[in-house]
């Protein structure tokens, strides 16, 4: 786990941290609450930089729902070193009473290459408590081959209150899809969960998921997980 320190600087909010995400102060327009480590990023897989390391960032709230944030993260052995894999990102967001929109952009160093990613996210909340969230990310890889220089990720999820808890389901790409020989693969993941409080201090969230095989000869993977959260 990482450690971070957040503090005000004028009208802005600033953070510094170790083993934290550079996107810690980003506002990603997604209200989906699934517990898996694949679809919970709402397709903001790379633009919302989450590689850990030494991180810094700042956010500013303009009021009326508009915010802007920026972040950077560096490997443990160096900061802004030409030989290190650093990442820089910016996030713009608008949040209203029943919907939100956000745009995230990142430049991620990969050795001597500089890859860029752009993520678009949005959600809408109905009066009955039902929420729909969606996201799409596209990337441009700094490689010599024009047939393998793009990435994609997408997501759509729905969630809302059912009984004492929250029911949700989503589908999307299982991580980032990378172009190969001019063809973008499509490996989808599906999941459904129900999160409910056992008592005032404990919440249990069972989830079932399926990940499609990466090829015709690769079998689909189906599994179940249970997340237990405690609060004191």
Put a short name on every predicted segment.
Residues 1-75, 93-97, 148, 155-178:
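Outer membrane beta-barrel
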Residues 9, 20, 25, 29, ...:
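Transmembrane beta-barrel domains of bacterial outer-membrane proteins
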Residues 16-20, 70-74, 103-107, 134-138, ...:
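Transmembrane beta-barrel strands of outer-membrane/channel proteins
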Residues 44-46, 80, 122, 146, ...:
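Outer-membrane beta-barrel proteins
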Residues 64-65, 83, 87-189:
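Detector for outer-membrane/organellar transmembrane beta-barrel domains
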Residues 70-84, 214-220:
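C-terminal/domain-terminus segments
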Residues 187-203, 207-213, 229-232:
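Extracellular low-complexity, Gly/Ser/Thr-rich intrinsically disordered linkers
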Residues 220-232:
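Outer-membrane beta-barrel "beta-signal"
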